[in-house]
Amino acid sequence: MQNSGAMKRRCWTGDDAEPLMLAYHDEEWGVPLHGDRELFAKLVLDGFQAGLSWRVILNKRARFLEAFDAFDPERMARYDRKKIGQLLRDPGIVRNRQKVAAAVSNARAFLAFEEREGRFGVFLWTFVRGVPKQNRRRSLRELPARTRESDAMSDALVERGFRFVGPTICYAFMQAVGMVNDHLLTCFRHAEIRRLSLPPLPKREGVRGRGPR
């Protein structure tokens, strides 16, 4: 008898993928994320991915969290040359000077944004009007590298001092944090993500303490 995991159809990873990639596809990718700090952390990681595969970043994610103080923007904004030097000697992360410098700069841009404009998550979600876009793609060939929305997000972030936030990075970010549902229709997660994106049902007024009959 086949186990339930083997019967699931996935879009961009298969049953033979390493456990971290399977778990990321099945539990994280495309789940709507709204927290300001969580979105900032994901944006930083996606910046480190530039030119690399997500598998590389995922395998280093735990060390990234340790090395960058759990992506706490207040701490990151205070990183000095000594701390940056330590990061560039850490084999557990991506040791790219421009990307490390951009992560620190982005922490400062994030804090400046919070002070001037408020909620970072609310701002990012405006590029899909606050509601996840439910795409209906049947092939990986249909997935775009960038869209008008990711172009607009990139422009807005660059204008506010963020770096390593090009349109392609922004679209990968939008896919990952559930702003768009890009699981293929044939993937078991498409319907699950769609249900997660639905607004909660309104509470019924005036009925208390009555169970099913």
Regions flagged by a language model, labelled:
Residues 1-199:
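HhH-family (HhH-GPD) DNA N-glycosylase catalytic core used in base-excision repair
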